[in-house]
Amino acid sequence: MSKQLIYSGKAKDIYTTEDENLIISTYKDQATAFNGVKKEQIAGKGVLNNQISSFIFEKLNVAGVATHFVEKLSDTEQLNKKVKIIPLEVVLRNYTAGSFSKRFGVDEGIALETPIVEFYYKNDDLDDPFINDEHVKFLQIAGDQQIAYLKEETRRINELLKVWFAEIGLKLIDFKLEFGFDKDGKIILADEFSPDNCRLWDADGNHMDKDVFRRGLGELTDVYEIVWEKLQGLK
């Protein structure tokens, strides 16, 4: 399958395929934090991210969630549907943590009675600012119906993920999703789902995600390997 590099991101390289509606995503060993300010090459990270994300996306597909995932091609590669990415990071929070705790001056780990959905404008030059529905409409990123769908679909995905992670003894604190338009103009889930873009805590409150790298708490791949091993025990 011939391929040509069309985009190089922090965590993945994207290549064309012979089918104009399909792309190959190649996961890198690079870890970044604080919008790329902290950066490090970590051997084995790309393989683990691809394994975890492929596994989760396969389960989401089976559960009826429309995603860009087609199949895992190799240790670091997966075949995806080509989408036009919506320039929003859709964050769902089940517990207080990270920037939420800093913004509102509250402790981490407080359970939210109703999960909170937030939007962040995907713009590196602006440091991905926190925005609301009216900003999304002003920037002509999405309309009312599309905004409502993004929130509804994110909440539906959350209900699935919470159950799966609870089954393996992990608490889903929060996560970030990205969506895009497929060739038919339908909004589908894109990007990835791995400890790079979610927070997972074990029963003792230990971080099982990229906060290990972000906060210098230990070896990233050791933690990701534990998450991957646990996921393989899911029914």
Curated annotation (Swiss-Prot):
Its Enzyme Commission number(s) read 6.3.2.6
Instruction: Mention one GO molecular function.
Output: phosphoribosylaminoimidazolesuccinocarboxamide synthase activity
The record's catalysed reaction(s) read: 5-amino-1-(5-phospho-D-ribosyl)imidazole-4-carboxylate + L-aspartate + ATP = (2S)-2-[5-amino-1-(5-phospho-beta-D-ribosyl)imidazole-4-carboxamido]succinate + ADP + phosphate + 2 H(+)
Domain of life (superkingdom): Bacteria
Q: Which GO terms describe its biological process?
A: 'de novo' IMP biosynthetic process; cobalamin biosynthetic process
Q: Which UniProt keywords apply?
A: ATP-binding, Ligase, Nucleotide-binding, Purine biosynthesis
Q: Name one Pfam family in it.
A: SAICAR_synt
User: EC class of this enzyme?
Assistant: ligase
CDD domains the record matches: SAICAR_synt_PurC
Q: In which pathway does it act?
A: Purine metabolism; IMP biosynthesis via de novo pathway; 5-amino-1-(5-phospho-D-ribosyl)imidazole-4-carboxamide from 5-amino-1-(5-phospho-D-ribosyl)imidazole-4-carboxylate: step 1/2
What InterPro entries does the annotation carry? SAICAR_synt/ADE2_N, SAICAR_synt_PurC, SAICAR_synth, SAICAR_synthetase, SAICAR_synthetase_CS
PANTHER family (UniProt xref):
MULTIFUNCTIONAL PROTEIN ADE2 (PTHR43599), SI:DKEY-6E2.2 (PTHR43599:SF3)
**Similarity section:** Belongs to the SAICAR synthetase family.
Protein name (record): Phosphoribosylaminoimidazole-succinocarboxamide synthase
- Organism listed in the record: Streptococcus pneumoniae (strain ATCC 700669 / Spain 23F-1)
Q: Gene name? A: purC
